[in-house]
Amino acid sequence: MSIFKNLLGGADKPGKPMEATDATFDEDVLKSELPVLVDFWSPTCMPCQVMGGLMRELGPEYAGRVNIYKVNVSQNMTTAMRFRIRSIPTLVFIRNGRIVDQLTGLVPMDTLRQRLDRLAPAPVVRES
């Protein structure tokens, strides 16, 4: 079946944003070995749709450095309330199970890159 997904472009791509739910949030996000960017969103929110496109664009660029998860606040109210999400889109940056940064509203791509680079610096390549 995965061969057909690959041919049709439906296979998971490295860095593709993943869904987290009330049931999976702790395991997927808080216990992640990699730093995590969580996009709290709703399908009825137009700025959220724009941010979703930015997340899909950034995902492959940060694959292996940052996991990106999306939480639909309409379907996962417990997690949204737990993180005191009052406005969407809200981006929460988590490292070692702790919030280290947060942004609300439509955020420019360069700001997202700066925050992600701060969250998970690129490895330094040294010439030998």
List the predicted regions and their residue ranges:
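Glycine-rich phosphate-binding loop
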Residues: S87
